[in-house]
A protein has these predicted regions:
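Hydrophobic faces of well-ordered beta-strands that scaffold small-molecule active sites
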Residues: 13-16, 38-40, 68-72, 95, ...
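Alpha/beta enzyme core
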Residues: 81-95, 99-111, 120-198
């Protein structure tokens, strides 16, 4: 499978772009565990054009996480074009256009999934951005605005005609938000369309490597993107290593369009077997270290705490409430490290029934 100049092994797993989740520390760990492609948090085009520092900081990427995409969103054509040009200078391997975010503050203003109510504008933005940059441009969107407007089959053809290099489809409508079940049958229908010749990436409700394997088998997608199931669980990409799913070391980036050639063979993917709770705490501590080094102590801790709140490894620990509160209120690296080390000791002495 190939997106632009990026070649992947068979059945690659991608990390979905998620606000307040896919910071650099988390992306690097997902990459080490085998994510074939990672994405930054989504970036507001208008804020980027206005040089809002908190937005500009999201463009920070590392060669260790390649291939990496930067995702932008907005509803103004000129702002999206200018933002894409700014993003290109940051040196990602591709630019992704977000036409799928369902939250009110985005879709309610006509951006993200709001574009599903203004498809001519969506196509105009896509066409203009593709023409403005040299990098591959991809799109992430949903099945439609609601169940009465399931437009994805025709929309996929229209987006392909605009020149995009790949399309990611989340198997819900905007009206569903994240409720109900993702409908992969329509994703499979797009993939089977003989007119479609770009890679189709499926997304929605994948919680394990085994479920990803089933999606590949059943719907024939070119890649599977995993989102919420990765929260506090970057090792999900290292699970099911015998499933035939390709790992990050099996993909590479050719030196084209100003993008350096990166080898992933040096990235260590811990084994999925015998990967203990203590090992997983080591991963969370490593995430903390990277975030503090690459961002700063305050925001690095804030980003890491979000993953600590979501990680499944603390489920089932007796009398854990006060420890959780302390963990999520910690303000220094030393304080948070001490809490995690104390948890490690408790888990060693009193193992939980769940191994994360």
């Amino acid at each position: 499978m190939k997106i632009g100049n990026i070649e992947f092994g068979p059945r690659p797993l991608f990390l979905a772009p998620m606000e307040d989740v896919t910071d650099i520390g988390f992306r690097m760990l997902c990459k080490r565990f085998g994510a074939a492609m990672v994405y930054t948090e989504f970036v507001s085009a208008e804020a980027l054009v206005r040089s809002v520092q908190s937005t500009v900081s999201k463009l920070t990427i590392s060669d260790e996480e390649r291939p990496v995409g930067i995702q932008i969103y907005g509803r103004d054509v000129d702002a999206m074009v200018e933002a894409a040009r700014i993003v290109e200078q940051a040196g990602p391997d591709l630019i992704d256009l977000n036409f799928g975010c369902p939250v009110k503050k985005v879709a309610g203003k006509g951006a993200g999934a709001g574009m599903l109510q203004n498809i001519p504008l969506m196509l105009d933005i896509t066409r203009r951005v593709v023409d403005a940059v040299r990098l591959p441009v991809t799109v992430k969107t949903r099945l439609g605005w609601d169940s009465d407007h399931l437009v994805i089959t025709e929309l996929a053809e229209q987006l392909q005609d605009c020149g995009i290099a790949a399309l990611t489809i989340h198997g819900r409508t905007r009206a569903q938000m994240y409720t109900g079940q993702a409908d992969w049958s329509l994703i499979g229908e797009v993939k089977r369309n003989p007119r479609i010749n770009i890679p189709i990436i499926g997304n929605g409700d994948i919680t394990s490597a085994e479920e990803a394997q089933q999606a590949f088998d059943r719907y024939g997608v070119d890649a599977v993107m995993i989102g919420r199931a990765t929260f506090g669980r970057p090792w999900i990409f290292g699970e099911g290593s015998s499933s035939g799913i390709s790992r990050s070391e099996e993909c590479g980036v050719r030196s084209e369009n100003g993008v350096s050639s990166i080898s992933h063979s040096s990235l260590h993917t811990p084994p999925s077997t015998n990967f203990t709770l203590s090992d997983k705490i080591d991963v969370l501590l490593e995430m903390l270290r990277i975030n503090v080094e690459r961002i700063d102590e305050y925001r690095g801790i804030l980003h890491t705490r979000r993953h600590l709140a979501a990680t499944p490894i603390f489920k089932g620990i007796p009398d854990f409430r006060q420890t959780r509160i302390a963990m999520l209120r910690a303000e220094t690296v030393d304080e948070l490290t001490a809490i995690l080390e104390d948890i490690r000791q408790r888990l060693t002495e009193q193992p939980t029934d769940y191994n994360g």
